[in-house]
Amino acid sequence: MHDKKVEEEILSLFNNEKTKKEGFTLLVNHFKKSIYFQIRRIVISHENTDDVVQEVFIKCWNKLNTFNGKSKLSTWIYRVAYNEAIQWIRKNKKEHHLNISEIQTEKQPTNNIFHKDAEEISILLEKAVLQLPEKQKITFQLKYFEDLTYKEIQLITGGSIGGLKANYHYAVTKIEKILSRD
């Protein structure tokens, strides 16, 4: 089913008291995977990600009736997820350390990126992204992994399009430097 149709169906079902639970179930089933991975890239650990995802869907249940339709429903939900992830990081700043060792490589790294398989490259990319400043990391993740437009990222993060483009450019440059060292 096309995303726009799904979003319309979710809102239609959710805004009717008799079908509200069905609409919410459809919302969760439709968005849980993408929301999980969006938050996981920010929060890192699986357990903490699960907690934040749960908070996102609780907030969606409580606030979906305030959705005004000025953006796509997916953009609104990504904004809720982004805000919850950032709130979790701020609340747990002392415990939330950049822990690159959490991402394990199974093979010994080689010095030439062209001799690495896709899994190794993916792990190296994840490690490189973890080393970015927060704004660059989030902008890169939303643009590269989620394939969102700058306008959609702006609606989620509240940043200016020019600032987002700069963050993405600096992120790509830093990632290239990091990957060329490995």
Question: Which role fits each region the language model picked out?
Answer:
Residues D51-I58, S71-N83:
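Structural recognition of an alpha-helix C-terminal capping motif at a helix-to-coil junction
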Residues E9-N16, L124-L132:
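Short amphipathic alpha-helical boundary/capping segments
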Residues H30-K33, R41-I44, Q141-L148:
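Short helix-capping/turn signature of helix-turn-helix
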Residues I86, Q136, L142, K151, ...:
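DNA-recognition helix of helix-turn-helix
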Residues D3-E7, E95-S122, T149:
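Internal acidic/polar
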Residues T66-N68, R79-N99:
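Arg/Lys-rich amphipathic alpha helix in sigma70-family domain 2
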Residues M1-K33, E152, R181:
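N-terminal module of bacterial RNA polymerase sigma factors
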Residues E17-L26, Y36-E55, I161, R181-D182:
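Short, charged helix-capping/linker segments at alpha-helix termini
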